[in-house]
């Protein structure tokens, strides 16, 4: 499959380690797509949970997926600043249907002042045991959690001061 073109829409599918679907974002506009990274945007898109419940996102968001990093980043544009929600996950895979990744439970919420909280450590411990995460996966995830925290401190990649604003402006070009 070729990479989606800028301006095209695609779904995002997250799975759990056991292969079960976790969550589907119905529509994301592609802003950049290369072998190394995909940047997309959405606003008020429908999200379907694994149990069939649905909800709609509240604000514009820029989504950043990397082929070599075991995390993805969602920058949410709110009235009081940019908030980030970071999923510790497998690198992305892409097919005709969607951008896909495995969600490994650990999350980092980053506030506009770049302080952060690591979330769902209990859920990670439970799923690590229940789904029998291999030791190698645990090591990879811990390493990439530390890499993510380094990116936050360094304001690297999607955490760079103008990154979200620049890509949001590009997104607005496609919504006119």
Swiss-Prot record:
Has nucleoside phosphatase activity towards nucleoside triphosphates and nucleoside diphosphates. This is Nucleoside triphosphate/diphosphate phosphatase. The active site is at residue 23. Mg(2+) 2 binds at residues 105, 107, 120, 123. InterPro entries: DUF402, FomD-like_sf, Ntdp-like, SA1684. Keywords: Hydrolase, Magnesium, Metal-binding. NCBIfam families: PRK13662.1. Coiled coil: none annotated. Its EC number is 3.6.1.15, 3.6.1.6. It comes from Bacillus licheniformis (strain ATCC 14580 / DSM 13 / JCM 2505 / CCUG 7422 / NBRC 12200 / NCIMB 9375 / NCTC 10341 / NRRL NRS-1264 / Gibson 46). It is an enzyme of class 3 (hydrolase). It comes from the Bacteria. Belongs to the Ntdp family. One of its GO terms (molecular function) is nucleoside diphosphate phosphatase activity. Pfam families: DUF402 (PF04167). The keyword Hydrolase applies. Its cofactor is Mg(2+).
């Amino acid at each position: 499959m070729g990479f989606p073109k800028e301006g095209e829409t695609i779904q995002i599918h997250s799975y759990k380690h056991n292969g079960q679907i976790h969550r589907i974002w119905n529509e994301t506009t592609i802003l950049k797509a290369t072998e190394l990274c995909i940047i997309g945007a959405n606003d008020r898109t429908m999200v379907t949970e694994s149990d069939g419940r649905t909800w709609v996102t509240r604000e514009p968001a820029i989504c950043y997926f990397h082929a070599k990093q075991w995390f993805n980043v969602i920058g949410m544009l709110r009235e009081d600043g940019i908030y980030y929600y970071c999923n510790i996950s497998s690198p992305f895979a892409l097919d005709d249907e969607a951008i896909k990744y495995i969600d490994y439970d650990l999350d980092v919420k980053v506030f506009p002042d770049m302080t952060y909280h690591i979330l769902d450590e209990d859920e990670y411990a439970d799923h690590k045991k229940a789904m029998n995460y291999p030791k190698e996966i645990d090591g990879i995830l811990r390493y990439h959690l530390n890499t993510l925290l380094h990116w936050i401190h360094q304001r690297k990649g999607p955490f760079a001061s103008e990154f979200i604003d620049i890509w949001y402006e590009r997104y607005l070009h496609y919504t006119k």
